[in-house]
Amino acid sequence: MPEGPEIRRAADNLEAAIKGKPLTDVWFAFAQLKPYESQLTGQLVTRIETRGKALLTHFSNGLTLYSHNQLYGVWRVIDTGEIPQTTRILRVRLQTADKTILLYSASDIEMLTAEQLTTHPFLQRVGPDVLNARLTPEEVKARLLSPRFRNRQFSGLLLDQAFLAGLGNYLRVEILWQVGLTGQHKAKDLNEAQLNALSHVLLDIPRLSYTTRGQADENKHHGALFRFKVFHRDGEACERCGGIIEKTTLSSRPFYWCPHCQK
């Protein structure tokens, strides 16, 4: 499943295609959304927001389209009039004079009013988004030490969208490698230096992955491009200590780590 940086880049592409342009045609596959087709025609997409792995498409009339791709949903941008060659099932089409965005295969799609947006169950449940520029390391540290999260092993906590939205498996293993911690560690057991380092890295690595388009390159981690240090690198030498990277399963997901320097 795509993680926060990939979802945000997808939203950027959708925004670049249709933001601020009048919608010339709107189509929904689901019957409960059909009444909104006429309401949205002629309106503008004002912005596309991400909340972890959910997308919120905001319209100029105050409505918001909520969509969660889950495992199979995917958005596409095409030239208006183009007919894509795909076996996927179309769910949403938002068309402007020159560009059209299409949502395929997703099933978790709703139209929300401004009031419903504040009470939506998923949006109420997710934590702050790691790509939200207003989120600070100090706030992350406070969440780590909160009664709700301080006794949770990082192997599960860093996959829990209620803790921080937008994290996922590759971010989990890269974050823990960067600070030299294991999946069994808990926030309550860390010293002040470890807590401060983790609070910063929980934001730094997702943001680095997003801003550098997640490209793999020979540059160093804090250089121009993001590069995996342990993810999918089992059997290779750890660049920090020379130990051999191993693969196991934690919280039902593949977990990559260096036993020599992550202790």
Swiss-Prot record:
Query: EC number(s) in its UniProt entry?
Result: 3.2.2.-, 4.2.99.18
Residues given in the record as DNA binding sites: 70, 125, 169
Describe the reaction catalysed, as an equation. 2'-deoxyribonucleotide-(2'-deoxyribose 5'-phosphate)-2'-deoxyribonucleotide-DNA = a 3'-end 2'-deoxyribonucleotide-(2,3-dehydro-2,3-deoxyribose 5'-phosphate)-DNA + a 5'-end 5'-phospho-2'-deoxyribonucleoside-DNA + H(+)
One Gene Ontology biological process? base-excision repair
Q: Which residues participate directly in catalysis? A: 2-3, 53, 253
Q: Which GO terms describe its molecular function?
A: class I DNA-(apurinic or apyrimidinic site) endonuclease activity; damaged DNA binding; oxidized pyrimidine nucleobase lesion DNA N-glycosylase activity; zinc ion binding
PROSITE patterns reported for this sequence: FPG_CAT (PS51068), ZF_FPG_1 (PS01242), ZF_FPG_2 (PS51066)
Zinc-finger ranges (FPG-type): 229-263
Q: Which CDD domains match?
A: EcNei-like_N
Function, as annotated: Involved in base excision repair of DNA damaged by oxidation or by mutagenic agents. Acts as a DNA glycosylase that recognizes and removes damaged bases. Has a preference for oxidized pyrimidines, such as thymine glycol, 5,6-dihydrouracil and 5,6-dihydrothymine. Has AP (apurinic/apyrimidinic) lyase activity and introduces nicks in the DNA strand. Cleaves the DNA backbone by beta-delta elimination to generate a single-strand break at the site of the removed base with both 3'- and 5'-phosphates.
NCBIfam families reported in the protein's UniProt record: PRK10445.1
- Which protein family is named in the record? Belongs to the FPG family.
**What is the protein named?**
Endonuclease 8
Organism of origin = Salmonella paratyphi C (strain RKS4594)
